[in-house]
A protein has these predicted regions:
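Charged, low-complexity intrinsically disordered regions
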Residues: 2-186
């Protein structure tokens, strides 16, 4: 298992190249300020990857203040299946909406469609998934932090967001494992 409540904060600058890649692939909106927290790296559910909480802020000139444009979960997985090329997977699992139709039809097997359907049922269209040269990049815009910890004198009530975040991470690992399902490596 892993401890989401006391997850490690990523070392300063360690995730910057990865965050830039998420922006280039179109998984998250571009912004001037990034804050990453609760970094987790390791194998889970049959896939090796990492997940972290990310907040993206963009400067809004007319209001003279930064505006939050993304606050959610980002994950990157190294797939065992040697997939070459790039494809964007839509949350509805429709292969005709993928950016590379041939690759999308090949990858959208029933287990992958089921994993995408679970994510869509929970988060609607706030999911962005891109496969690029054997790596799966997924972002879910939750528009909230992973943890809403109570204040100093507040009672710890309604802590349902902690298991909900754990479920989100588990569903992302399930998606990566589904993409690798049936792959023997030979």
């Amino acid at each position: 298992g892993y401890d989401l409540i006391y997850g490690r904060n990523p070392p300063r600058g360690r995730l910057k190249p990865l965050i830039t890649l998420f922006e280039i692939l179109g998984c998250i909106p571009r912004g001037q300020y990034h804050v990453a927290r609760h970094w987790f790296v390791g194998p889970l559910g049959g896939a090796d990857g990492q997940a972290f909480e990310l907040t993206v802020w963009r400067w809004r000139e007319e209001e003279l203040r930064p505006v939050r444009v993304f606050h959610g979960l980002c994950a990157r997985f190294a797939l065992a299946r040697p997939i070459k090329g790039s494809v964007r997977l839509r949350a509805d699992g429709n292969p005709d909406q993928g950016s590379d139709l041939t690759l999308a039809h090949r990858l959208l097997t029933p287990p992958v469609r089921a994993a995408l359907a679970r994510l869509r049922a929970r988060h609607g269209d706030r999911i962005s998934a891109v496969i690029r040269d054997g790596l799966l990049f997924v972002a879910i815009d939750l528009q909230r932090p992973w943890y809403r910890l109570p204040g100093l004198f507040a009672e710890e009530v309604n802590m349902t967001h902690i298991p909900a975040t754990a479920d989100d991470i588990e569903m992302l690992w399930d998606l990566a494992a589904a993409l690798d399902a049936g792959w023997s490596g030979s």
